[in-house]
Amino acid sequence: SYTYNWHDFNDLICIILKTIIEQGKGIEINTAGLKYGMPEPNPCLDIVKMYHDLGGEIITVGSDAHEVKFFAYRFDVVADMLKNAGFNYYTIFNERKPEFIRL
């Protein structure tokens, strides 16, 4: 299994997240790696917390479901993760406009 130490890239990740926020964009939490033994969705909880603490609000959830059986795979994990990071909602897009759904 592959692991990485995101702390090695902390400064760069912070710059990227600030840029995303300044441009009114968001990030996605993706659960696909959980199918292959990763310990948590990507990005990890610490990066999601950093995004929140920097003022990030738009956050979507994906699973890379290339098969029906993986549609919304382990989204239960993400709900808890978002709450632990300080979020009260996640984001969906309707006609390219963000809508915030309470957790």
For the regions a language model picked out, list residue spans one by one.
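Charged catalytic cores and adjacent phosphate/nucleic-acid-binding surfaces used
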Residues: Y4-L103
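Active-site-proximal loop/short-helix segments
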Residues: S1
